[in-house]
Amino acid sequence: MAPKAAAGKKPAEKKPVEEKKAEEVPAEKKPKAGKKLPKDAGRPDKKKKRAKKSIETYKIYIFKVLKQVHPDIGISSKSMGIMNSFINDIFEKLAQESSRLARYNKKPTITSREIQTAVRLVLPGELAKHAVSEGTKAVTKFTSS
C-alpha cells in the first residue's frame, strides 16, 4: 500500500548537491598568528612517521672513560653492549642493597650514607675503596657548587 500524500502539499524541492555541501561545511579557519600547522596537515593520505623511542644507555660515557684511560684503543659494539649491561646490573644491585638498608633502619629516604654502605657490601675490596673515595669526591663537588 502506498503512503498517503497530504492533499495540497507539494513535495519538498531538492537543492543541488553543491549548494548543500557549501552550507554544511564551515569556512576554513585561518591559523592564528604564532601557531604553526603540522607538516602533514596538507597531506592526509600519507602515513605519519613514528617517533623513535629513546633508549638510555651508558655507551657515550663508557667511550669517554675508555679514551681517558687508553686513547689509542677502540671498542666493538658487542663489547659496548656487554659493558652497558654490566653497569646496569651493578646499579640495580646497589639500588636493591641501599633500599634494603633503608628498610632495615626504618628510614623512608635513601641517602648517600646508604649508597656508600651498599657500595662497600656489593663491591669487593680495593674496588669498593676506590668507588667510595670517588663517590665522596663527587658528592663534595656537588654540594659545594
Swiss-Prot record:
Pfam families with a match to the protein in the record: Histone (PF00125)
Molecular function terms, GO-annotated: DNA binding; protein heterodimerization activity; structural constituent of chromatin
Record carries keyword Signal: no
Identify the InterPro entries for this entry.
Histone-fold, Histone_H2A/H2B/H3, Histone_H2B, HISTONE_H2B_site
- Biased composition (Basic and acidic residues) is annotated at 10-44
Localization = Nucleus; Chromosome
Instruction: Kindly summarize what the UniProt induction comment says about this protein's expression.
Output: By wounding and methyl jasmonate.
UniProt xrefs under SMART domains: H2B
Instruction: Output the PTM entry.
Output: Can be acetylated to form H2BK6ac, H2BK33ac and H2BK34ac. Monoubiquitinated to form H2BK143ub1; may give a specific tag for epigenetic transcriptional activation.
What keywords would UniProt list here? Acetylation, Chromosome, DNA-binding, Isopeptide bond, Nucleosome core, Nucleus, Ubl conjugation
Q: Which Gene3D superfamilies match?
A: Histone, subunit A
The reply to whether rRNA processing figures as a keyword in the UniProt entry is no
| Positions bearing the Glycyl lysine isopeptide (Lys-Gly) (interchain with G-Cter in ubiquitin) cross-link | K141
Which residues are recorded with the post-translational modification N6-acetyllysine?
Answer: K9, K35, K36
Q: Where is this region: Disordered?
A: 1-52
Tissues expressing the protein: In anthers, floral buds, pollen, petals and fruits.
Q: Name one GO cellular component term.
A: nucleosome
Subunit-level organization: The nucleosome is a histone octamer containing two molecules each of H2A, H2B, H3 and H4 assembled in one H3-H4 heterotetramer and two H2A-H2B heterodimers. The octamer wraps approximately 147 bp of DNA.
Write down the PANTHER family for this protein, in alphabetical order. Answer: HISTONE H2B
The similarity comment for this entry is: Belongs to the histone H2B family.
Protein's job: Core component of nucleosome. Nucleosomes wrap and compact DNA into chromatin, limiting DNA accessibility to the cellular machineries which require DNA as a template. Histones thereby play a central role in transcription regulation, DNA repair, DNA replication and chromosomal stability. DNA accessibility is regulated via a complex set of post-translational modifications of histones, also called histone code, and nucleosome remodeling.
Identify this protein by name: Histone H2B
Q: Which organism is it from?
A: Capsicum annuum
Its lineage opens with: Eukaryota, Viridiplantae, Streptophyta, Embryophyta, Tracheophyta
